[in-house]
């Protein structure tokens, strides 16, 4: 679309509510997300909330779920589904203190089945929280200055930032901006305090939501900050990504990338993953006006009729990248500068010990699929609690579901190392390169969207793939593999070298050819297949890779060069 052409506005916020989707009416009539949530929480007859309140509660980081392992049995017994709630914390950049960790641990043991989950967007999730415990959990988070606002819903979600801030002054500066961006973009409604803290409603002089208005964003909107050479946050998967540009170790500004998004629907070919497009560069002091300008374009022009078509990536591909850039610049009042050079060389976490420029040390631990839990042979949750009781630095959740024990003085390292060994937290030293670069979403039994297993299945599948790797001498080679229980892509499977997305119980789509640094989408290799076909395909392709790869060539690059899949140049061609 030509930048001067006025785009079609038949599906955006300019239209009357009755011309748009039902979710828009729900938001508009919710009294800024209040709905009837208080009444739903007070209803002791059911362990659930109403369908409309469940949608509104997403804006407060809460998903209503049920235990699908026993859903059919409860239905046969004519019982209500075993409802519970997932609660996600707002934690920009993934940073928390030992005191906060200890409180999170306590809340998980009291209200969430003795487990805590680290997410792919650098935060914590509590699962299996009962309705009557929601307020207690959220008020417990308030005690440690945390909340769950905008962790889900049609808003900014969690703001990501490359870890580890204390490895350099640049990291610290960018993390501080990411934290400010989260506070800057979070919704302003007083509903959160009224519902969860049981506060009185406060009168406001101006609009309750001066930026979002009554209908908020068309869909989720994700923001992330990357610091080259690390692309650990998968900046190209963000709706709005900022790539830090430094000069002599100091932050100069950011390249601006827009339109990333990895969700799709198998039955809808109009949906596809898309990598963000870099549209220019801004000086650091232009960051917050740029956030407002880009978000406001999506707020005003995003599709509010069809939620499958409502993400920013579709707005960009429909209106045209040139028009979107021009409209952003019009709202900014200045033109973006040309993109600055940068290079990404890694996407995963450097596990183990690293010393920062200030002399402090940091240890990145492998947390398989982000699940912090005690098992008979691995008391991980107890071990991390023991470390938090003596640690004087910070904890940092990584975008790969791992955990960094950060800011350790050299004199304190032996004590931390001893606890790691005592509780088996140093096992990353004996794991395969594939397992250390693996991720899985939660999926069954709690996620209502899952079509197949993910977190509960991937570790066993990896053991079988590791036998193949061992055969070909590839055990230590870093290869990214990501699995999700549905096509929505929470674990970012479409930019993995090996991606698996659930289609039905025991059945998955197999994707190959993603970029090791997160710079390229993969492509479907096999559709709707079970474990035998997956292992056979990986035996063939990995064996070929071991024999014929070029020096330094990653598996995803080889899969394309060898002709197993074609390179996906743009997201809209993903389904071709």
Swiss-Prot record:
Keyword annotations of the record: 4Fe-4S, Amino-acid biosynthesis, Cysteine biosynthesis, Heme, Iron, Iron-sulfur, Metal-binding, NADP, Oxidoreductase
Top enzyme class: oxidoreductase
Cofactor(s) for this UniProt protein: siroheme; [4Fe-4S] cluster
PROSITE patterns: NIR_SIR (PS00365)
Binding site for siroheme: 490
Enzyme Commission code(s) on record: 1.8.1.2
Compositional bias of kind Basic and acidic residues: 1-12
GO molecular function, one term: 4 iron, 4 sulfur cluster binding
Swiss-Prot/TrEMBL catalytic activity: hydrogen sulfide + 3 NADP(+) + 3 H2O = sulfite + 3 NADPH + 4 H(+)
InterPro entries linked to this entry: CysI, NiRdtase/SiRdtase_haem-b_fer, Nit/Sulf_reduc_fer-like_dom_sf, NO2/SO3_Rdtase_4Fe4S_dom, NO2/SO3_Rdtase_4Fe4S_prot, NO2/SO3_Rdtase_4Fe4S_sf, NO2/SO3_Rdtase_FeS/sirohaem_BS
A Pfam family it matches: NIR_SIR_ferr
Pathway: Sulfur metabolism; hydrogen sulfide biosynthesis; hydrogen sulfide from sulfite (NADPH route): step 1/1
Region span, Disordered: 1-26
Cofactor note: Binds 1 siroheme per subunit.
HAMAP family recorded: CysI
Family: Belongs to the nitrite and sulfite reductase 4Fe-4S domain family.
Subunit record text: Alpha(8)-beta(8). The alpha component is a flavoprotein, the beta component is a hemoprotein.
Name of the protein in its database record: Sulfite reductase [NADPH] hemoprotein beta-component
Gene responsible for this protein: cysI
